[in-house]
């Protein structure tokens, strides 16, 4: 039997039908496709980080509970006393932990669409059913349709990204409360972009018995560390910890995260600068003919172009700027591109590349 035949026989058909998550090559390009913080660590923080990493006991397994981080985060986020936390190797691992513990074959994971692609991908990985409820044309939640879907499918897990990725907007609180009240299982509020908005749902973990909140340090400047966080009632965290792999946060990441928390005001300054750049960039994009700009509460801006989006994307790449092509990913994203908010210099270069690309495609 050939390798191909064995794969056809033994790899689950739904996995064979998938494509591996693609990360574009950004070599030599201004990278504005992945919502990363463009600013480097301050020199003094880098020096301190170097010492902390040097002192890490890499010959030993790391603290399995990352206890020092737990203490630091409880103070940083003013976590309710009744709440606990769980850490993952990025938010992706936390989504996987949630799905493994709560969903599975014969159960349903529900989210709105378009939203973060990993909700659907991980549902497929674990053999759960996935239900995606389309957003309205303005990318707000269709409350009645969503509530009807919850009633019909009785999802074990509901994921809501707030602000939403890739659209960048916030959903209104009243609709979210209706979803929480109607959901029979666990509702996960994904606050990956919380640093760029005033919205905060941490109090909901004590207000509701079926809500957990997910956050990450990736968007504030620590994407390379892959550190995700989940906050919820102690009883939920106790169950979820049973499927978390031991020692999943390595000692270098633990030391680096502690260093970052000690200097968190520096990262707050950077996120404030990016929020200012977002406002400036949105205003500039509003003046570009043929471009529709959508409101954003994240560190990226969704735009729709009146030309073939793939051609505009390719022309921008040819001009040295890499953005995210969303056209083709979901019917409601036809003609759409996602632009990460970078430094002022990067944003100026992106605007220049966009103008040139539009002119080239328009002919």
Swiss-Prot record:
InterPro entries: Aminotransferase_I/II_large (IPR004839), HisP_aminotrans (IPR005861), PyrdxlP-dep_Trfase (IPR015424), PyrdxlP-dep_Trfase_major (IPR015421), PyrdxlP-dep_Trfase_small (IPR015422). Pathway: Amino-acid biosynthesis; L-histidine biosynthesis; L-histidine from 5-phospho-alpha-D-ribose 1-diphosphate: step 7/9. Its EC number is 2.6.1.9. One of its GO terms (molecular function) is pyridoxal phosphate binding. Keywords: Amino-acid biosynthesis, Aminotransferase, Histidine biosynthesis, Pyridoxal phosphate, Transferase. SUPFAM superfamilies: PLP-dependent transferases. It comes from the Bacteria. The modification N6-(pyridoxal phosphate)lysine is found at residue 219. Pfam families: Aminotran_1_2 (PF00155). Gene3D superfamilies: Aspartate Aminotransferase, domain 1, Type I PLP-dependent aspartate aminotransferase-like (Major domain). It catalyses: L-histidinol phosphate + 2-oxoglutarate = 3-(imidazol-4-yl)-2-oxopropyl phosphate + L-glutamate. One of its GO terms (biological process) is L-histidine biosynthetic process. It is an enzyme of class 2 (transferase). Its cofactor is pyridoxal 5'-phosphate. Coiled coil: none annotated. NCBIfam families: hisC (TIGR01141). Homodimer. Belongs to the class-II pyridoxal-phosphate-dependent aminotransferase family. Histidinol-phosphate aminotransferase subfamily. This is Histidinol-phosphate aminotransferase. It comes from Hahella chejuensis (strain KCTC 2396).
């Amino acid at each position: 039997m050939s390798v191909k035949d064995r794969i056809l026989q033994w790899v689950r058909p739904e996995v064979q039908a998938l494509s591996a998550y693609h990360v574009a090559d950004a070599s030599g390009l201004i990278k504005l496709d992945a919502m990363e913080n463009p600013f480097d660590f301050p020199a003094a923080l880098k020096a301190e980080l170097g010492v902390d990493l040097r002192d890490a006991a890499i010959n030993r397994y790391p603290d399995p509970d990352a206890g020092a981080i737990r203490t630091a985060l409880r103070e940083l986020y003013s976590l309710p006393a009744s709440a606990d936390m769980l850490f993952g190797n990025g938010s992706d691992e936390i989504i996987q932990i949630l799905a493994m513990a709560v969903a599975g074959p014969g159960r349903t994971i529900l989210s709105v669409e378009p939203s973060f692609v990993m909700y659907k991908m991980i549902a497929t990985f674990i053999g759960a059913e996935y239900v995606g409820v389309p957003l309205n044309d303005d990318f707000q939640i269709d409350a009645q349709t969503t509530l009807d879907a919850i009633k019909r499918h009785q999802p074990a897990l509901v994921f809501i990204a707030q602000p939403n990725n890739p659209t960048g907007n916030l959903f209104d609180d009243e609709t979210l409360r209706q979803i929480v009240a109607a959901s029979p299982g666990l509702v996960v509020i994904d606050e990956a972009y919380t640093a760029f908005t005033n919205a905060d749902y941490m109090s909901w973990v004590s207000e509701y018995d079926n809500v957990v909140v997910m956050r990450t340090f990736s968007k504030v400047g620590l994407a390379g560390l892959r550190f995700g966080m989940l906050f919820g009632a102690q009883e939920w965290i106790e169950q979820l910890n049973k499927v978390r792999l031991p020692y999943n946060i390595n000692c270098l990441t633990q030391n680096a995260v502690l260093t970052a928390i000690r200097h968190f005001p520096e990262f707050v300054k950077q996120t404030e600068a990016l929020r200012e750049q977002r406002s400036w960039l949105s205003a500039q994009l509003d003046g570009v003919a043929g471009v529709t700009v959508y409101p954003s509460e994240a560190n990226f801006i969704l735009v729709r172009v009146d030309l073939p989006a793939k051609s505009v994307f390719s022309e921008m790449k040819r001009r040295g700027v890499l953005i995210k092509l969303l056209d083709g990913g979901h019917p409601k994203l036809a003609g759409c591109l996602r632009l990460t908010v970078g430094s002022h210099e990067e944003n100026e270069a992106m605007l220049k590349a966009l103008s040139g690309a539009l002119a080239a495609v328009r002919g």
